[in-house]
Structures are given as structure tokens and as C-alpha cells.
A protein has these predicted regions:
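Alpha/beta-hydrolase superfamily serine-hydrolase fold, recognizing
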Residues: 1-232
């Protein structure tokens, strides 16, 4: 049995218990299932705002990158967490992205980039303050967000991704700060000796985790001074 299958079954059982009986808070306004790419299922997002605010009122933005070992999860599983952030005065963007092994790296990074571009393009429509964009990532989402933040701040790293994958982050995007929860930020010999990590990387990466591939997804290697403030 694939590791991704095991992860999906085990994680789903716990998530169902956690979310049982939860409902949308009365003080949150939500805009659901907005398609940001070609895949209407996996490339979709929700926007949550405090209901007491007018849509014309620009609010600071929090972008949530969900976890799930790169192989599991979607925006539905993080909706209640994200709505709790909206209750604190933020416009929150909660998105699904394409998962491995069906969609190999860099699909999830491409999707993350599309979402940030979508935010800039729809700032007026949804009341986003693009001068105050923050982001949170959980587990695999923390790894992806760390990687993406490197692409936004490290020109040499960004050049590699542009040449290899055609990814180019929006020039006018500035992420003010990030919060990274329970992520893995380096994939060396010690880390890859963990059977689950090794198996997940084999499903996540197109060539199964060659040294070159692992080097490209190491977050800590490419952090420079321009990296924004981070809460770990």
C-alpha cells in the first residue's frame, strides 16, 4: 500500500472527529469555491471576512497553506481554523492545491503562486490590503510556504525555478510575515533515513527524490536576509 494511501486514511479519520458539528460562525462572511486555475476541484479557494465589515473596506490578508504530507487535504479541512482568523479582523484566503502522487512537484508550488497572483488581481473585489499580506503554513504547507517565500525573496533561487519550471512570482507581491507550523525544511541523508519521509518524497517528486530534486526543495539552504519575519 502506498504511503499516500495510508496517510489519507489515517488523517481523514482524525479530521472527521475534529470537525464534527462545527458550523460557520455567524459573524463571518464567506465566498466559497472560487476557481483560480483550470482544475475546478483542486484549484479553488474560499475567502472569509468579518461580516461586520463592508467589502469596500480593505483588510489585512492571511493566506493559509494547508498540510497533509503533500498527498492529503484540501481547503475544507482548514475552513474553521481560517474562519477563526477572519473573526480577528482579517480577510483570509483558504485554498486547495493539487496533491501528489497524482500531481507531482512543482504542481503545488505553481498553485500557491497562482493564488498569490489571484489575490493581487482581485484586491478591489474582495477588499484585500495588498500592502499587508501575511501567510501561515501547516506541516507540508509550512514547507511549501517557506519554499515559496524563498522564491519571492532570493533572486538566485527564483531564477532556477523560472528556468526549470516557468514559475515567476508577482513582482509587486510582498509577504509581510509568515508563520510556519511543524514543517520540515531540510531533506538530507539524516532526514531521508526516515521511512515515511523517504516514501512521501518518492511520491511527491517526479524522479523519486534525486539529490538534485531534494536540493531544490530544501528551504533552509536558500533563506537570505530579505526573508520576512517568521514565527516558527
Amino acid at each position: 500500500m502506498k504511503t499516500s494511501t495510508i496517510v489519507r486514511k489515517s488523517f481523514a479519520a482524525g479530521d472527521m472527529i475534529r470537525d464534527a458539528g462545527l458550523k460557520t460562525p455567524e459573524d463571518v462572511q464567506r465566498f466559497d469555491d472560487i476557481v483560480y486555475g483550470e482544475d475546478k476541484v483542486w484549484q479553488s479557494l474560499d475567502v472569509y471576512r468579518p461580516k461586520a465589515t463592508n467589502i469596500e473596506e480593505k483588510l489585512p490578508v492571511i493566506v493559509s497553506v494547508h498540510g497533509g504530507g503533500w498527498v492529503y487535504g484540501d481547503k475544507k479541512l482548514y475552513q474553521f481554523y481560517c474562519m477563526s482568523l477572519a473573526q480577528r479582523g482579517f480577510a483570509v484566503v483558504n485554498f486547495s492545491y493539487r496533491l501528489a502522487p497524482e500531481s507531482k512537484f512543482p504542481a503545488s508550488i505553481i498553485d500557491t503562486d497562482l493564488v498569490f497572483g489571484w489575490i493581487l488581481d482581485h484586491a478591489e473585489e474582495y477588499g484585500f490590503d495588498t500592502e499587508n499580506i501575511f501567510a501561515v503554513g501547516d506541516s507540508a504547507g509550512a514547507h511549501m510556504l517557506g519554499l515559496y517565500t524563498n522564491l519571492c525573496t532570493n533572486p538566485e533561487y527564483a531564477k532556477v525555478y523560472k528556468e526549470k519550471f516557468g514559475i515567476q512570482t508577482p513582482q509587486d507581491l510582498k509577504i509581510r510575515a509568515v508563520a510556519l507550523n511543524c514543517g520540515q525544511y531540510h531533506f538530507g541523508l539524516e532526514e531521508m533515513s526516515n521511512e515515511m519521509t523517504d516514501n512521501l518524497m518518492k511520491e511527491f517528486l517526479p524522479e523519486g527524490g534525486t539529490p538534485e530534486e531534494l536540493g531544490l526543495v530544501n528551504v533552509d539552504t536558500y533563506v537570505i536576509e530579505k526573508f520576512p519575519p517568521v514565527y516558527l
